Amino acid sequence: MKKILLSVALMVASISLHATDANYQVVPLPQSVTAEKGAPFVLEVFTSINVASKDDAMRRNGEFLKQYITEATGITLDDQNKKGNTITLKLNPKIENEEGYVITIKAKTITIEGKTPRGVFYGVQTLRKSLPLEKAKSVTFPAARIVDYPRFGYRGTMLDCARHYFKMDFIKEFIDMLALHNINTFHWHLTEDQGWRVQIDRYPKLTEIGSKRAQTVIGRMTGLYDDTPYGGYYTKDEMREVVKYAADRYITVIPEIDMPGHMLGALAAYPELGCTGGPYKVAEQWGVFPDILCAGNPKTYEFVNNVLDEIVDIFPSKYIHIGGDEAPRVRWQHCPRCQAEIKRLGLKGSNGFSAEAQLQAYFMNQVAKHLESKGRNIIGWDEILEGDVDKGTTVMSWRGVNGGIEAAKRGLDAIMTPTTYYYLDFYQKPDNRMILIGNMLPVETTYGYNPVPDDAAPELKKHIKGVQANLWTEYIIGRDLAFFQLLPRVAAMAETAWTENNKKDFASFKTRETRLNELYKHFGWKTCQELYKEKK
């Protein structure tokens, strides 16, 4: 028996591959693959799937595997047949990692074991991605043993549905894409200056008024507008449907209600929540706006708490994202109520941050306490570090990596999502035909990021919980452009999230991702092809 790490050269040397052979060169890269002696497993119509558990989640894993096999090969397994070879899904409490799995491939059986149904699901995904994408009567799986587990417990992707609204069929397809890449968190950005996308029963004007903008700027801040009303929002039933669809694929949906800034959608509906009283309108162009929630108005806190009460009733996630980014405090500086609140609380500028920054920290901490009373914790963008932060807060480090480092120093957990590596609204290649937010982010750069260097301080290693890619949608309209911006960079991020850093290799990734690109094409995902081109 020869132990190998899954790399292109070693796998090709160890396991002979033919058109209808399974290929264990998958994305993300498993921690280890061992080529075993013995005859291969031959998948054919007489193969059966045995779920060694009465657990509903395990049964669903079996159904997914059957669907994936038919999807890739055209082979429809006979559930009633008991005479052929078997793929067995089973739980194994001896596996250490909650999301880890072991696949053992022998002549008569393929066994996928996990400590939890979630781990088994990731094993199913690996088997799925090893399948050849062609119609076949049989597929040969070389004898092998795969032992795998994730590097990070948080592996996320954010979709901004506030600047541009995406319909339910796309949301589900997006979730399917996450599942394919072993991503376990869907961060759903739902409110913005340009539109409020969440049904809240207590405040119907949020969707009656706040979800609609009269028009949208054309191009990159041209001053020209399309004169076309734009809107859309998700009902509670639709959001619950998304939560269920994601949960079936072991993905947690974390909603974001951004505050106190990026709130013109809400202020247009309820102007009394702003410092000036309005009138306000839903933003028709992109950027940051000075009007934010009034932190000196008790009705603001009542509004926020009531909204979040309805949010936690829809979303069972441990975390609720409450934003905290890009909140200009100029209105607070001149607002009598905000200044009175600063005086009442005895807030003063310190450590380079103003009294108004301390007021924002107070605001965020009040929201955190309310959510903690509901059994939840908050996530916020790294601006929330501009003041004293509630100890249960998790920080998303987006303005580079320093936010994550500072959070760790304060004993706070952090998720690394720096713009220079993980902002997928950036260009992937020079292209004058496309209008995007700007900057260049090729897949090589995304792949090369290491959120926790080997020589990192122990505090950093302890508190960095994972990574996340973000798709902001100022210039992303529709399914095709969304997938073009997402892939293959989501795959690059996913490998960083899953695979130990010392096992990553970009040349290997390119080969493996080129195979996965065939599956993207099968789904009709029009992805950026720059990675797959032969370099001259």
Q: Where do the PLM segments sit?
A:
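Flexible, acidic glycine-rich loops studded with aromatic residues
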Residues: 377-393, 398-536
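Feature activates predominantly on carbohydrate-active enzymes
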Residues: 96-302, 306-319, 366, 370, ...
